[in-house]
From Swiss-Prot:
One of its GO terms (molecular function) is DNA binding. Pfam families: HTH_3 (PF01381). Transcriptional repressor of the integrated CTXPhi phage gene rstA2. This is Cryptic phage CTXphi transcriptional repressor RstR. Keywords: DNA-binding, Repressor, Transcription, Transcription regulation. Residues 18-37 bind DNA. Coiled coil: none annotated. The keyword DNA-binding applies.
Length: 112
């Protein structure tokens, strides 16, 4: 995944508009749109500001140490964090029951 795709995906995951990002970084909307379209690259200073605004590290933004699969998982976790407490508890309960089910199946399959 290219940086332009990570910019757009992460921005959408945290429910920010391109205009909000441009404002937080202190650049024009046109400049920010060029980053997401791949027509322009941010300066190092702006890269730091973008990572902060996107609530991720520069390494994550640049795709370092993160597989696409891990990045997708992180985006999902960040979306879950935006849910209210009751919705988060419901997801936690479903996840816990799936993990128990998986463990039980694993024990039964290896014990047979």
């Amino acid at each position: 995944m290219k940086i332009k795709e990570r910019l757009a995906n992460q921005r959408k995951a945290i429910n920010k508009t391109q205009a909000q990002m441009a404002d937080e970084i202190g650049i024009s909307l046109t400049s920010y749109k060029k980053y997401e379209s791949g027509e322009g690259l941010p300066t190092m200073e702006n890269l730091v500001k973008i990572a902060d605004a996107l609530e991720i590290s520069i390494d994550e933004l640049c795709g370092r140490w993160a597989t696409d699969e891990n990045q997708e998982l992180m985006l999902r976790l960040k979306k879950i964090q935006q849910l209210d407490e009751e919705e988060q508890k419901a997801i936690s309960m479903v996840l816990e029951s799936m993990l128990i089910r998986h463990s039980t199946k694993s024990i039964l399959n290896h014990g047979a």
